[in-house]
């Protein structure tokens, strides 16, 4: 079995972390070192690349993960943008069946189906546990005494 590679923590050089745990460690160490975290920035190509803010542009120009991310962008040209705040849910639905432009005098003949990609953009994320806890806080609690 091959020994696992270790990375050095950018927040504390005394920390040597296995590569498989490095991202978790970065999040933990960032919280424990807020002063140093304010001076550091995360690479947009790899979240495990944390460098001083003044070196970020230089790092991103030569980042080894840069080409992989740029290739994904060219292979997948579909861009999804969130709906604007002006749009509301009552907008008119697009017909799933558009008539062929060649046939204009016959209703519903040779109908071509249109693929519509619907995306979910939550306005507020609420966990099931949060709602249970808030219900417990608002409901009066019954005090149990021995012998009841």
UniProtKB/Swiss-Prot annotation:
Spell out the PROSITE patterns in the cross-references.
Answer: ZF_CHHC_U11_48K
Q: Name one Pfam family in it.
A: zf-U11-48K
**Annotated positions binding Zn(2+) 1:** 9, 15, 25, 29
Molecular function (GO) terms for this protein are:
protein-containing complex binding; zinc ion binding
Q: Where are the zinc-finger regions (CHHC U11-48K-type) in this chain?
A: 6-33, 40-67
Q: Which domain of life is it from?
A: Eukaryota
Q: What are the UniProt keywords, alphabetically?
A: Metal-binding, Repeat, Zinc, Zinc-finger
Q: Does the keyword Repeat apply?
A: yes
Q: List the disulfide bonds.
A: none
Q: Where is the segment annotated Disordered?
A: 67-99
- Binding of Zn(2+) 2 occurs at 43, 49, 59, 63
Q: Is this entry keyworded S-adenosyl-L-methionine?
A: no
Record field: compositional bias (Polar residues):
82-95
Q: Into which family does the record put it? A: Belongs to the UPF0224 (FAM112) family.
- What's this protein's name? Gametocyte-specific factor 1-like
């Amino acid at each position: 079995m091959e020994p696992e590679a270790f990375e050095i923590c950018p927040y504390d050089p005394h920390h040597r972390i296995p590569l498989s745990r490095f991202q978790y460690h970065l999040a933990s160490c960032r919280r424990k070192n807020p002063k140093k975290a304010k001076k550091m920035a995360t690479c947009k190509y790899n979240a495990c690349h944390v460098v001083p803010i003044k070196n970020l542009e230089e790092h991103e120009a030569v980042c080894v993960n840069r080409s992989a991310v740029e290739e994904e962008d060219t292979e997948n040209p579909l861009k999804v943008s969130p709906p604007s705040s002006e749009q509301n849910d009552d907008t008119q639905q697009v017909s799933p069946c558009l008539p062929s432009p060649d046939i204009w005098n016959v209703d519903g003949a040779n109908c071509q189906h249109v693929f519509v990609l619907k995306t979910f953009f939550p306005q507020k994320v609420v966990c099931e546990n949060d709602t249970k806890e808030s219900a417990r806080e608002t409901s009066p609690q019954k005090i149990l005494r021995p012998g009841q």
